[in-house]
Amino acid sequence: MKRAIVVVIDSMGIGAMPDCRDFNDIPECNTLKNVCKFNHGLNVPNLAKLGLGNIQDFEGIAKEANPIGQYGTMKEKSNGKDTTTGHWEMAGIVLKEAFKTFTQTGFPQEIIDEFIKRTNCGGVLANCAASGTKVIVDYNDEHHATKYPIVYTSADSVFQIAVDTDMIPLETLYDWCKIARKMFDDLGVTVSRVIARP
């Protein structure tokens, strides 16, 4: 075989992992089952033909007597639950140590100070775990007044930088992201992703 194509439906969980409480999840979590229940079914005939409905009882997804694909659920060996950890494991990389998250407190002041120093951005706003749409709305006026980037994280191991590209050029945002990536690597802080949010 010359090539394999892997299609991932990211964040479509089908039940909790045994270590769910280590990552502040509840044992009852099941994204697909809850989406099916909320919508009173789900019209996914091709996934049903592949055997998706045979994994569990999902409202509106039929069981397939003769599926055209292989189906099942998997349990990660890696220590972690974020997108990157799962994708890396599918490619054969098992992480013994989870990527660092900053969900409870935001990033330590030393990291923020180092980011400000390396980028010469003058300061940052937010520095908390937040929904991207909400944090941008909450800090929009202050962002326009100061031109400081909005820096935030989530439940995943991410350092996200949001700016209004009418004020801060897109190329500057990308440069700041490259600087942040190198900074985390230099400091030995295992942050999975640095994300630009123009």
Model-derived regions, located:
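Extreme N-terminal starter segment of soluble prokaryotic enzymes
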Residues: 1-5
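Active-site neighborhoods of enzymes that stabilize oxyanions during catalysis
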Residues: 154
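Extended, H/D-rich, highly charged conserved domains that either
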Residues: 157, 163-198
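Active-site nucleophile/metal-coordination loop of metallo-enzymes that catalyze phosphate/sulfate
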Residues: 11-147, 157-164
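Hydrophobic faces of well-ordered beta-strands that scaffold small-molecule active sites
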Residues: 149-151, 194
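Generic enzyme active-site microenvironment
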Residues: 8
